Amino acid sequence: MDEIHHDLTYSDKPHTTFLKAAPEAEDISLIFTAATKTFNIAGCHTGTTIIPNPKLRSIYDREHAAFGKTPNRFGMIMTEAAYREGAEWLDQLMDYLENNKKIFTSAMKSIKKLNVFDLESTYLAWVDFS
């Protein structure tokens, strides 16, 4: 499950992780997340994989190693710094995105055949063209 936008939630819409929403799927779940979208550090090539099932984790680790993947130390430092020191910046970003959401939704209302879904998170909009 891709939860890369999990940090980009609006104040009235908290994120619910897939594992909390569907605990019965824990044994077959892989959750992927990263600070890259939130803090614009995609160039660091880092991410986090959450795998509750030890057997599945072992398979994942083996396959990951087979591709010669090793941890990116610089990316790990950037991620840690972003989460430790970036709260104020993230708050400002969310205020900015909230304003953009209002502007976009208002503009789309003028186009009769388009319907914008209520944005609960992220900077992406879902628009119904049908």
Describe these PLM feature segments.
Residues 80, 89, 95-108, 115-129:
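Conserved glycine-rich beta-strand-loop-beta hairpin in the small C-terminal domain of fold type I
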Residues 1-3, 33, 48, 118, ...:
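Short beta-strand segments
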